[in-house]
Amino acid sequence: EERLFSVESQHEGMHKKLNHWTFKNNFSFQHSASQNYVHWQSQLKSKKKFNLADAQMALAVDVLQSNIKLIPELSVQYQLIEKGLYSSFELGGDRALYTLRDLYISNPYLQYFVPEDTSSEELPSNTKYYTRLGLNGNLFGGVSYQVSVAATSQDNFMHYVHHSNALDEWMAPAYTALKSLELHAGLDAQWTENIHFWLKADYKRFDQYLSYVPNMELGLYGFYHYNEQFYLSGSLRYIGERYAMRLDELNYFDEGQKLDP
């Protein structure tokens, strides 16, 4: 059983030094299985324009139960070529509390499992920090591109592993501290208001062995807007190699089976 109640507020204004500012608050109450969680997030964000750059700065206070975290955020975009090429830098993070819904949806086999089969009945949270460098620009009429490299650190990344003992086999979520490096490239083409295509590619490197998590993903997406009532959309995706991990009854690594892309 799971219930979630959330209230959000937002205030905006102008200031001589802060320019445009936004103050957001989110309060949520989550009941999952037999546990209750209270999560409050508050963020003050400011935008400022310079000659060739746009900057966005924020500071968030995240309170989960009695644990408090301060999460800074910085985003800067600088114009290299007028209306043609931009560089960007991002630094930020967030904390998310897992839900039972997350556990079921992320299960690669969607098989039934009991939350008590995990290491603890209490759901963990995942705190993520990242930094990203990127370039984006325009090629020719209606076609734009972007490339970026990002480094990410997470304290409780969730993936699914197989467990076994002398009597039974089952699947359950595992949580691990994870550092990763991601390369991203994208191409966007919108020649008319009705036809839109975009291509994206992502490649990731992890410092841990993960189960059912691909290291590469390619995608081609299309959208055609016929009129106010009808539209067509479609996609082609390729997922890179993955491994299915199996742990023994003492939670030691037993084997890893390579899956077909």
Describe each region flagged by the PLM.
Residues 1-51:
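Outer-membrane beta-barrel transmembrane domain signature of Gram-negative proteins
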Residues 3-7, 36-40, 68-72, 125-131, ...:
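Residues that define the transmembrane beta-barrel architecture of outer-membrane proteins
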Residues 7-13, 27, 42-48, 61, ...:
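Residues on the lipid-exposed face of transmembrane beta-strands in outer-membrane beta-barrel proteins
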Residues 13, 27-33, 48-52, 59-65, ...:
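Transmembrane beta-strands of outer-membrane beta-barrel pores
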Residues 14-23, 50-57, 82-87, 141-147, ...:
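Repeated loop/turn-to-beta-strand initiation elements of outer-membrane beta-barrel proteins
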Residues 64-68, 72, 77-148:
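Flexible, glycine-rich linker and terminal segments associated
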Residues 101-123, 154-178, 204-219, 238-261:
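Outer-membrane beta-barrel domain signature, especially the mid-to-C-terminal portions
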Residues 122-124, 130-136, 146-198:
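Outer membrane beta-barrel strand-and-loop segments of large Gram-negative receptors
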